[in-house]
Amino acid sequence: MSQDSFKQYLLSEFNIQFNNETLLLEALTQRNYLNEHPDEPGRDYQRLEFLGDSVMQVSVAEYLFKRYPNWHEGQLTEMRIAMVQTRSFAHFSRVAHLNEGIRLGKGEEMSGARDRDSLLEDIWEAFIGALYLDQGFEAVRKFLDQTLFAAVDTDFFDRFIDFKSRLQEKLQKNGAVDIDYRTENEQQLSHNAQLFEASVSVDDHELARGTGKSIKDAEKAAARAALKLLEEK
């Protein structure tokens, strides 16, 4: 996608129009591109990536603080950690099509860098840093509302939360207990896929069950279900 097309895309999809377009170019520029174009002014994305990391931390913390007024500090911290996992940033770079605007060197382009998670993680933070410098926190929040924050009501961030450790910590708060996970059922699905059902019990009393495409995922789902039951009591 050309830079003009990418700027038009940002405007039509997110209502984002940079006042200082140099910031946008910097956020999308890899070092190898500048090495191959020494006559072009400007920097690569790395300084903006540094800034964007901090902007993400603050934006996510504020979002969670306001959205979940009854959550304690531990719950807020755990969810914040899950939401600012750099592994998730690569996903949201693709969702927002930031990968299509990156300025790459020819060698990096040929090696598939445009779809490389590590680069997309960096570009996400650099874009956030550039948007913050250009338009402030409110513009960043609006962009996140359409991308990262929109995923909060799905199970996307569950992959980054250790529900088994959370359950163990909660159950053993007042002393040692015996926590046992069992595989209760296994189904063979189409295309060689499998579905597992697992249970979690405490001192031989079953708390909850969960399903997943692997035993590990099923146990994690069971732990999550158990936590939900305990938190509702």
From Swiss-Prot:
Pfam entry (one): Ribonucleas_3_3
Primary location: cytoplasm
Broad class of enzyme this protein falls into: hydrolase
GO cellular component: cytoplasm
Domain DRBM span(s) in chain numbering: 162-232
Needed cofactors: Mg(2+)
EC number: 3.1.26.3
Catalytic residues of the enzyme: D53, E125
Superkingdom of origin organism: Bacteria
Molecular-function GO term, any one: double-stranded RNA binding
Catalysed conversion reaction: Endonucleolytic cleavage to 5'-phosphomonoester
One GO BP annotation of this record: tRNA processing
Cellular localisation: Cytoplasm
Assembly behavior: Homodimer.
Protein name: Ribonuclease 3
Protein source organism: Leuconostoc citreum (strain KM20)
Highest classification ranks of the organism: Bacteria, Bacillati, Bacillota, Bacilli, Lactobacillales
Gene, per the UniProt record: rnc
